[in-house]
Regions:
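Residues that flank catalytic or metal-binding motifs in active/ligand-binding sites
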Residues: 1, 31, 49, 107, ...
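A conserved helix-loop-strand patch within extracytoplasmic ligand-binding domains
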Residues: 1-41
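Structural recognition of the beta-strand scaffold that forms the well-ordered cores
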Residues: 3-6, 34-38, 109-114, 133-135, ...
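A bilobed periplasmic-binding-protein/Venus flytrap-type ligand-binding module shared by bacterial periplasmic
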Residues: 6-11, 54-55, 143-157, 173-174
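Short beta-strand->loop
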Residues: 24-27, 109, 123-141, 150-152
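Non-transmembrane alpha-helical segments in soluble domains
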Residues: 24-27, 50-54, 71, 159-166, ...
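Ligand-binding pocket segment of bilobal, Venus flytrap-like solute-binding proteins
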Residues: 52-134
Length: 174
């Protein structure tokens, strides 16, 4: 699915923060230390968001902020870079279900997640969520996830596992 920025609507309202309408907005002082991004090195949503930021800033555009300038501004603005999606969403993000998990820190009101994460939050939380997707043009990335049996000595079990992954039983839980 699509990867995008998600934000905590209650925190934004409660702290009187402006809802970002551009990537430049989250480099401002009101968002200092309140953004958690999964590392593009170890996280596929992190990689997807990094690619979206490349597109957003037109890679090496001569007019205005460059992609690398934005990332440097985020570092200077105390962005929390995590080891992966789980740490960003469950440990740092205030708008998700992480607040009910062990190790929760809750210091970030914006994170990278799937654009459908707020819907999933609502589904499992009695049709209510405080999380929303940010609709900032050119900041989303479509990620395809797949499974494959490429080589090895257990082709039969690999095939059975893939059949299980695509079964109605598994997909009804997603």
């Amino acid at each position: 699915g699509y990867i995008c920025l998600n934000y905590d609507t209650e925190a934004v309202d409660g702290e009187n923060l402006s809802v970002p309408t551009s990537l430049e907005d989250v480099t401002g002082p009101e968002w200092r230390g309140k953004v958690a991004l999964p590392s593009p090195v170890s996280s596929s949503p992190g990689r997807g968001f990094m690619l979206a930021s490349l597109d957003y800033f037109d890679w090496q555009s001569d007019d205005g902020l460059k992609f690398s300038d934005w990332w440097s501004s985020m570092v200077a603005n105390d962005v929390v870079i995590t080891s992966g999606w789980t740490e960003a969403y469950e440990t740092h993000y205030t708008g998700g279900y992480g607040e009910w998990t062990e190790g929760y820190i809750g210091d970030a009101h914006i994170t990278v997640s799937y654009c459908h994460s707020p819907g999933v939050e609502s589904y499992y939380n009695g049709n209510w969520t405080k999380s929303a997707s940010l609709d900032i043009p050119k900041t989303s990335f479509f990620q395809v996830e797949y499974a494959s049996a490429v080589s090895g000595g257990n082709a039969l079990y690999a095939q059975k596992f893939i059949e299980y992954l695509i079964s109605p039983e598994v997909n009804s839980m997603m």
